[in-house]
Each structure stands twice: as structure tokens, then as C-alpha cells.
């Protein structure tokens, strides 16, 4: 038996499609939104639509930004010769929180996963290889320590080594299967400082 009106059920269903939002969370969010003042709901909806319309990939590193080139890539204070490769923008943000990495990033927007049908052509590897034609000294591979992250790291390493560019992998300390965005800054720093050459 459906206890909610059609509109409430639709809202719960749509919110439940978001990653990390289960049925109970979707229900809580739906009722919170329904009880918000109309102006706040309109502002929330407009903010979401604006973000969807205006956020794009940085032309250099592929992170999400509202500019053609993100602030990190356009900063003269960053070492453009050292590129850290991460799976997503959340991982980039996790390293930025440490305040210790002064290089630049490349965001893959995924990891190789044959089980899910995700191959090298489905992530931003082509863009990375184009960047490496420039003046690059080191590529630090900071993919997650999951099977997919490890497979992606090995694939990237094999692609880059023939170019004579130093390739390193962040050290463990990041638990196997752990997502970087949930790791504290100290652990991330230790992983970065203890990286190994591949």
C-alpha cells in the first residue's frame, strides 16, 4: 500500500536515484524539501540547474569547473611539471585539503573496470596522454586502492614509461578498497610522501 501522494512518491523516487541516498534518506530529504519555504526550494532548484548548465571540464586537467581553465591549472604558483592523476574531482579536493601538493592534477572521471564494461577509452586517458607531450617530469598515480584503481594505475604506468617520464604511485596507508575522498589529510600526506616509482 502506498502511503504517500503521487507527487511525494515521485520526489522520493527521484531523490533515491542519487548515489549514496537510500530509501530512508530519500524519504527524509523529500519531507524536508516539502516543508521548506517555497523561495528556498526555488533557490535550490535554480542552483542545481545553474550548476548543471555552467559546470564543465577544465580544458587542461578535466576537473569540474565553471571556467575554461580551472584555478589550479591557471595558477603560476603550481608546478606544471608534476601531474597527479586521480579518479574524480572529489579525490582532487581531498588532496587539496592537505595544502601540501603544489603540482597539478589530471582527473580521469572513472577507473578501468572490465566487470562494469569500462575500458581505457571510457575515461580521460587520451587527454592525459596529450598533456604528457608537453614538459612533464613526473606523473603521480593516485587512483583508489581498489581492484579498478590498481588496474588503472598499472595501465597508465605501462603507457607512460616508454616516454621516459618518471611514474610513481602513492604509497599504501590508504586502505585497499578505500575511496580517497574519505581519507584524512595525514594519511593522504603519508601516502603521497611514501609514493613508489613504477
UniProtKB/Swiss-Prot annotation:
<dbReference type="InterPro" id="IPR034137">
    <property type="entry name" value="TOPRIM_RecR"/>
</dbReference>
<comment type="similarity">
    <text>Belongs to the RecR family.</text>
</comment>
<dbReference type="GO" id="GO:0008270">
    <property type="term" value="F:zinc ion binding"/>
</dbReference>
<keyword id="KW-0479">Metal-binding</keyword>
<feature type="zinc finger region" description="C4-type">
    <location>
        <begin position="58"/>
        <end position="73"/>
    </location>
</feature>
<dbReference type="InterPro" id="IPR000093">
    <property type="entry name" value="DNA_Rcmb_RecR"/>
</dbReference>
<dbReference type="GO" id="GO:0006281">
    <property type="term" value="P:DNA repair"/>
</dbReference>
<keyword id="KW-0227">DNA damage</keyword>
<keyword id="KW-0233">DNA recombination</keyword>
<feature type="domain" description="Toprim">
    <location>
        <begin position="81"/>
        <end position="175"/>
    </location>
</feature>
<keyword id="KW-0863">Zinc-finger</keyword>
<keyword id="KW-0234">DNA repair</keyword>
<keyword id="KW-0862">Zinc</keyword>
<dbReference type="InterPro" id="IPR023627">
    <property type="entry name" value="Rcmb_RecR"/>
</dbReference>
<dbReference type="Pfam" id="PF02132">
    <property type="entry name" value="RecR_ZnF"/>
</dbReference>
<dbReference type="Pfam" id="PF13662">
    <property type="entry name" value="Toprim_4"/>
</dbReference>
<comment type="function">
    <text>May play a role in DNA repair. It seems to be involved in an RecBC-independent recombinational process of DNA repair. It may act with RecF and RecO.</text>
</comment>
<protein>
    <recommendedName>
        <fullName>Recombination protein RecR</fullName>
    </recommendedName>
</protein>
<dbReference type="InterPro" id="IPR015967">
    <property type="entry name" value="Rcmb_RecR_Znf"/>
</dbReference>
<dbReference type="InterPro" id="IPR006171">
    <property type="entry name" value="TOPRIM_dom"/>
</dbReference>
<dbReference type="Pfam" id="PF21176">
    <property type="entry name" value="RecR_HhH"/>
</dbReference>
<dbReference type="Pfam" id="PF21175">
    <property type="entry name" value="RecR_C"/>
</dbReference>
<dbReference type="GO" id="GO:0003677">
    <property type="term" value="F:DNA binding"/>
</dbReference>
<dbReference type="GO" id="GO:0006310">
    <property type="term" value="P:DNA recombination"/>
</dbReference>
Amino acid at each position: 500500500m502506498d502511503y504517500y501522494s503521487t507527487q511525494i512518491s515521485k520526489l522520493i523516487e527521484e531523490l533515491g536515484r542519487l548515489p549514496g541516498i537510500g530509501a530512508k534518506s530519500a524519504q527524509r530529504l523529500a519531507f524536508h524539501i516539502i516543508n521548506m519555504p517555497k523561495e528556498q526550494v526555488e533557490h535550490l532548484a535554480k542552483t542545481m540547474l545553474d550548476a548543471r548548465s555552467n559546470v564543465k571540464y577544465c580544458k587542461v586537467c578535466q576537473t569540474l569547473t565553471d571556467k575554461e581553465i580551472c584555478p589550479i591549472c591557471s595558477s603560476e604558483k603550481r608546478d606544471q611539471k608534476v601531474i597527479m592523476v586521480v579518479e574524480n574531482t572529489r579525490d582532487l579536493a581531498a588532496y587539496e585539503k592537505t595544502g601540501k601538493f603544489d603540482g597539478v592534477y589530471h582527473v580521469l572521471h572513472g577507473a578501468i573496470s572490465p566487470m562494469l564494461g569500462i575500458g581505457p577509452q571510457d575515461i580521460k586517458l587520451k587527454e592525459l596522454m596529450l598533456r604528457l607531450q608537453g614538459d612533464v617530469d613526473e606523473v603521480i598515480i593516485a587512483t583508489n586502492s581498489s581492484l579498478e584503481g590498481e588496474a588503472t594505475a598499472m595501465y597508465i604506468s605501462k603507457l607512460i614509461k616508454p616516454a621516459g617520464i618518471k611514474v610513481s604511485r602513492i604509497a599504501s596507508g590508504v586502505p585497499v578498497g578505500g575511496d580517497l575522498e574519505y581519507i584524512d589529510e595525514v594519511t593522504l600526506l603519508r601516502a603521497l610522501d611514501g609514493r613508489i616509482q613504477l
